């Protein structure tokens, strides 16, 4: 007799009911992204979810910093099955990798509330439209297209393109290409490239990162990463980063603890000298999901 799925559950329950091994890059990537709390995976899921994260960070340049994030998606089936309420820091698919994982909490974006309309849903193609309000009561709208391979191969390609308008700042675009490849021992190699243009920029922001992610068990995962962040005008690399994220599901299916030490070589402006500093993040996250019945 099959166990009935709970109406409300800790997101760790989803992984504990699945086997660790996967020969599919898409399947393993989904598990990794859900475990590490990557916003894309929750926003595109069939369930509602909320993640509340407290963040403590330190680096030798900015000293200690503290932050709180609320992210997630709440389906609104009584209004329309294709409409959801989104809590997000992101425009379209996301800010660049550097902003989401900067060595200072204060450099990360604050949470915004948006209504999202799922315009089309196919196995490979999805199109979303989002309208929301920023904390200063400025409006913002965006459209996001996502293409992803629909296959069981060990390699998976994903491309997303977002176009958006911010009241007071003008138009912008965000592009992301991501390549996942499954290795032995439940390991995943991920190469991610981001480019952002905005009317207020003289050029573009870009990020390229390489990660090796590994599930150690249903409760533990590790990610080693290196990334380069820069701007095109004036052309310079704003940071080189090396680090590791160690994340564990603790005590309850809805509670995660994460430690992220690393080292960054920063250049905060074109005319400034590059500085190197170690950094460390400590995150405690509550992650709860709900099926719509």
What residue spans do the PLM features occupy?
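Transmembrane beta-barrel domains of bacterial outer-membrane proteins
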Residues: 1-293
